[in-house]
């Protein structure tokens, strides 16, 4: 989040000025209309006495407010704070976003966090104004709206793809959140959504992956192209118009996803501040995997970052200031598969390619050059025991090392450092990309404390400028 205060007076000033930097950081609701909005909503600013503020969309919905049809507050990326924070609340939010509550319930979420369900409920409600069930419900509602308005998928399929347990639950939630039926939402879709409705299950699910602020797509696609492992990934097309495609192993099945590069992916949003999106298309063997697949892409492309906060801090450093000016909104790429990233951080690209050819699972329906899933840790541990690779994959397979979105970063680092032969520099890379830590500096590198808490981003600026090599 930005360094500006977020007390209610400051929040109201952000609403008055339609400041898009606060979109997702908080939401406001108007008691006289029963509607909640993002701070940059272009509608007439309501009177201060009629406004209530909420930390999350789920909290606003839980208080009986409906999403504004003009600014679509549910579509904005949530606060970047929850991806930065390493405490139980941040870990819980990341797990909920990954669909854990939909798959395993609140008890499963609590078990992953090492707390009781009551403790998790209390902590989330205290900080976010909503518990895990409400947060998961808000996410399902948003996913459903996007699918209803931008695809031609049948309503029944959308209900289950969004994570709902029944069509009735889906219909009731849509009415409660949007004051519309699914059919009415589809009829009211924006023009770009209507244009994309030719999509069918066989053609995949087209989605726009929103980001806040400026986004430097080029360096991200450069990295993905440099690292791409044949059979699992490919990058095609000329710079500025490339497409990244890869296979995914998901909780219910498999997927092939494609994300397009958008040159200068910024646009004028509400107010004077830019925002934008990346176009994606997802082919899933089981539509229930949609939420998880989308979250993995968001982590890979670092779409939930707050570039305003990052750039403001780093631009204050004389060495970094010209780099930030040259590449505003530079991201710190993550990964679509944390365990795969850990193995690839240890091996070279040619070795990873060999592992895929020898141990990767062949897709039932290959698509062009995409033919395999990256081998699972248990398969590698059994096939190539001994050495650092064997020790690492065994630790991953036994869950001695956890790299999922809810993993404790310090615990994971300690467990990785305990793997024989795994050096601290490789562990730092895994912590940065697999665990999404924005503040990592490799050992032995003299990095100023003034770059905290965004040292991972600072190093990406140096790498993009050719002043530092990560490996």
Please place each PLM-identified region on the residue numbering:
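HhH-family (HhH-GPD) DNA N-glycosylase catalytic core used in base-excision repair
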Residues: 1-471
